[in-house]
């Protein structure tokens, strides 16, 4: 489930230090700055700027203290700034512009770019942006603007496609487009989850998932 930008960023970190995690630590610091800035902008939608400055570090601290980030350097941690800023764009629109104004093409394109980055880091985290675009599409449909909804989806998909361009060129030049698809999409969707092979039945899958969610919530009460 690990995408190209994840390897690219870790490759840059490796250039800083071949034998330590100094480069990865620097990468995490840079990402944390974007996390903090995004959290602050979200809070500013609801509270005074000074209050947002005080609360933002606390929110980030609680997030990093989560069991999900226990080991550090996970794909989810790399995705976090893109998810936070995507959340900010949607909250800003629905809090300050909807229903009087349609979401601008610039914001839709930005949302697509963020989704494209997540798709090339860990595509299974795209569920957030699927819901994001569905909400925007429904905001157009609520105004009976079907053409606007289609146009908005097109702009979003255009933005989402842009982060793929460097990798399409790279793998095409190396004659490895199919290998890219097979390793990143096919294996993760069909082989990794064992959907096509013999495995546990539906009831056992539900039981296992419920047990996992129980222990995750028990270790981190924030999930409640």
Q: What role is predicted for each listed range?
A:
Residues 104-123, 129-135, 158, 162:
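Membrane-interface alpha helices of multi-pass inner-membrane proteins
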Residues 128-164, 168:
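Perimembrane helix-loop-helix junctions
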Residues 34-62, 80-81, 98-106:
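Transmembrane-helix signature of polytopic, membrane-embedded enzymes
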Residues 1-22, 29:
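Short hydrophobic/aromatic helix or loop-helix immediately within or flanking a transmembrane segment
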Residues 80, 160-164, 204-224:
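Alpha-helical transmembrane segments at the extracellular/periplasmic loop-to-helix junctions
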Residues 69-78:
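Short acidic/glycine- and proline-prone juxtamembrane loop motifs at membrane-interface regions
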Residues 152-197:
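Membrane-lumen/periplasm interface segments of specific transmembrane helices
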Residues 44, 86-110, 140-143, 215, ...:
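Membrane-interface transmembrane helices that cradle and orient dolichyl/undecaprenyl
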């Amino acid at each position: 489930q690990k995408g190209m930008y994840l390897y690219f960023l870790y490759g840059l970190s490796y250039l800083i230090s071949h034998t330590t995690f100094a480069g990865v630590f620097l990468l995490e610091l840079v990402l944390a700055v974007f996390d903090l800035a995004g959290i602050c902008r979200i809070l500013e939608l609801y509270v005074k700027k000074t209050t947002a400055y005080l609360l933002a570090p606390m929110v980030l601290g609680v997030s990093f203290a989560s069991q999900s980030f226990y080991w550090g350097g996970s794909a989810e941690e790399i995705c976090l700034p893109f998810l936070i800023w995507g959340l900010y764009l949607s909250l800003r629109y629905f809090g300050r512009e909807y229903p009087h104004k349609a979401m601008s093409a610039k914001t839709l394109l930005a949302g697509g770019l963020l989704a494209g980055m997540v798709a090339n880091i860990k595509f299974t985290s795209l569920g957030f942006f699927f819901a994001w675009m569905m909400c925007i599409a429904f905001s157009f449909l609520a105004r009976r603007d079907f053409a606007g909804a289609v146009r908005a989806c097109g702009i979003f998909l255009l933005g989402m496609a842009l982060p793929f361009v460097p990798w399409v060129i790279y793998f095409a030049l190396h004659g490895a487009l199919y290998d890219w698809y097979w390793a990143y999409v096919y294996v993760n969707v069909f082989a990794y989850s064992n959907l096509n092979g013999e495995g546990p039945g539906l009831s056992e899958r539900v039981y296992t998932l419920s047990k996992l969610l129980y222990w995750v919530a028990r270790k981190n009460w924030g999930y409640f």
